[in-house]
């Protein structure tokens, strides 16, 4: 159950870290945004290692669905952009795929 917490926190730190670079490089904000970006992306990587999974690739694949959910939420809540129907449809497919991976029997080393 803690896996979901680690995934959620990792997603927040990854999105914020990437968004900080976006602000600097795409919106002309101060280069000082690199500092919180690097801290946030480091925390993202550390948190993702807390997931109880035998293989990194499987953990990252399952995390991808949660990241996409968090990204669409970020789009609406932080950037104040209403997600399109295609955003919701793509999100649904990704969540289904991530759920299949999460519920699979091979989360521990065989």
From Swiss-Prot:
InterPro entries, per this entry? UPF0060
Q: Name one Pfam family in it.
A: UPF0060
Where do transmembrane segments lie in this chain?
Answer: 5-25, 28-48, 59-79, 84-104
Q: How does it sit in the membrane?
A: Multi-pass membrane protein
Q: Which GO terms describe its cellular component?
A: plasma membrane
| Keywords for this protein | Cell inner membrane, Cell membrane, Membrane, Transmembrane, Transmembrane helix
Return the SUPFAM superfamilies for the record. Answer: Multidrug resistance efflux transporter EmrE (SSF103481)
> Where's it found, cell-wise?
Cell inner membrane
Q: Which family does it belong to?
A: Belongs to the UPF0060 family.
Enumerate the PANTHER family for this protein.
UPF0060 MEMBRANE PROTEIN YNFA
Recorded protein name is UPF0060 membrane protein PSPPH_1503
What lineage does UniProt assign to this protein's organism?
A: Bacteria, Pseudomonadati, Pseudomonadota, Gammaproteobacteria, Pseudomonadales
